[in-house]
Amino acid sequence: MPERRVFIIRHGERCDFAFGKSGLWINSFDSRGRYRPLDINLPRTLPKRADGWQGFAADTPLTEIGYLQSKLTGRALRDNGIEINHVFCSPALRCIQTTVGLLKGMGLDKRIQFSVEPGLYEWMVFARYARPCWIPPKDLKKLGYPVQENYVPCWTDKELRMNETLADFYQRSFGSINKILSECTEGNILIVAHGASLETCTRQLVGGDIRSTDDFYYLLQNTPYLSCVEVNSREGLWRLVGSPIPSFSHTYNRTFDPLQLVTKDLASLKREREGKDNMRTTQ
């Protein structure tokens, strides 16, 4: 039996996390929903969605840096000789856009379509008890995304439980990866999902037990954007072998206020900045 390889990657930098405290993301929309980015790192344009611009509050897009991260990671996969035959991703917009960036970086955006799998969505606890609303595959197709419109998912959005426990989330992830593997019996698979997915999609596949909540959160907090993990199989036995590409590291670049150059009371600005930084470290 030939070796099979599965690569699981976290999405790129998201707008709400990058700009949540500054307000620049939400304030880029006016009262009529017209969008004008207030920071160079905010996306220049946004896709139209049936639920209106308000839908971006719970289904955030990538930042410009997030999309660049995706393309650079795709290039790294290509440079390391990684071949991909099947692609699946979470229905979250940030995962959709990350998938597009990865395929572009690999030079596969004209050759491979990806399938949107709701079973790969993040733990429902993070949905904050509001059922998520995504852009449907048929609408993504109309917007130009290379989506397999006729794909039959393992899970539907209505099957995702709002009271999902951590054990339920592990089982959903494990069930999704098993269904994908049963349908794609040959070739290598790329899965683009969430930070926790690198753990929950592989843990039971390689014979591990569901982790404690504390251990789960530790791993989640130490899985940065575009992290990648590989599992491979010989004779039907799966093992985790690390990542086929190096880590993606860069520094945090804060918002610049040009008016500070003409402000006399820099002490008050310093206190305000330190307060914001302290809030950031506790989130």
UniProtKB/Swiss-Prot annotation:
Residues of the active site: 10-11, 194
SMART domains the record matches: PGAM (SM00855)
Keywords, sorted A to Z: Cytoplasm, Hydrolase, Protein phosphatase
A GO cellular component annotation in the UniProt record: cytosol
Cysteines joined through disulfide linkages: none
Function text: Phosphatase that dephosphorylates some steroids such as ecdysone 22-phosphate (E22P), 3-epi-ecdysone 22-phosphate (E22P) and 3-epi-ecdysone 2-phosphate (E2P) in vitro. Also displays acid phosphatase activity towards 4-nitrophenyl phosphate (pNNP) in vitro. Has no activity towards 3-epi-ecdysone 3-phosphate (E3P) in vitro.
Name used for this protein in its record: Steroid-phosphate phosphatase
Organism: Caenorhabditis elegans
